[in-house]
């Protein structure tokens, strides 16, 4: 890598550090917008952390966790189940958060909303859009 490239990277990192949001934690938020009596079961993990199981009733109940990005690529993978627990009928597994690599994010918000037809995503500034469909549990694949 030449001196110009290295200097440019240092300037970008320093400029990002001077941001007012510097060191503000990132967050992942889950909201249960499923039908009446449908519980949302959530389990998220990273390379270093298992955040345990969380159960959300329908309505305004949310689950949120906060963290700082690591230079070594912060990732959180989550599993979601929906149904009338303990019998869950639908499942989804996806990456709920991935850092930007060498340039850490600060104050980034990933909002996931579970609805009957799937899981919707937004950063909070735009209308949520459908990202993942639910997979039925225990149903053999159709031929």
Swiss-Prot record:
Disulfide bonds: none
Keyword entries, A-Z: Secreted, Self-incompatibility, Signal
Signal peptide extent: 1-20
Subcellular localization: Secreted
GO cellular component: extracellular region
UniProt key word Protease: no
Keyword hit for Nucleotide-binding: no
GO biological process, one term: rejection of self pollen
UniProt similarity note: Belongs to the plant self-incompatibility (S1) protein family.
Protein name (Swiss-Prot/TrEMBL): S-protein homolog 11
UniProt organism field: Arabidopsis thaliana (Mouse-ear cress)
